[in-house]
Amino acid sequence: VERRLKEAFPGITFDVHGVPKDVAGARDLAERDKHEFQKWITATVGAQPYKGGKKGMDRGIDGYLHFRDADKKPQFAIVSVKGGENITSGMVRDLKGTMDREKAALGLFLTLNEPTREMEKEASSAGFYETGGMKVPRLQILTAAQILDNRRPQVPFGFTEGFKKAEREKSGQDRLL
């Protein structure tokens, strides 16, 4: 809703209550409801929650981020979210396996906590995704702190198409004519 309001009414200002604004808020949400944390962080990076955010077996997939390559062919990233305290390189390895199984171009590991050095090594071992002269890490790790600081996944051409765009509303002045 927030994203669509901003698209429809550029320059609009409003407050959203109940959504994390800092790491403490993200941690509180994760402790209270892991599923809501997962939906929040997935949507915040512009991805779609798996099966619309419904609970159930997800086979290691918490969301998808859709984009197009240099040839305008649809591609996707698999999103894996970990909101717990204990995260390991095995979790990144599992995402890499899921990416291969699902033939995903990219993988996004979204976490509440800072990754370990071993996790970063595992992510970098996935290599790079290249299209149209652009090169981005194939498996990317982003923390809640980075996301709250407006850092987003590196996607070729910076273009994602996860959600339908809201139509831009005409200003009040335009309606008077």
Predicted features, each with a name:
Residues 1-177:
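Mixed-charge (Asp/Glu-Lys/Arg
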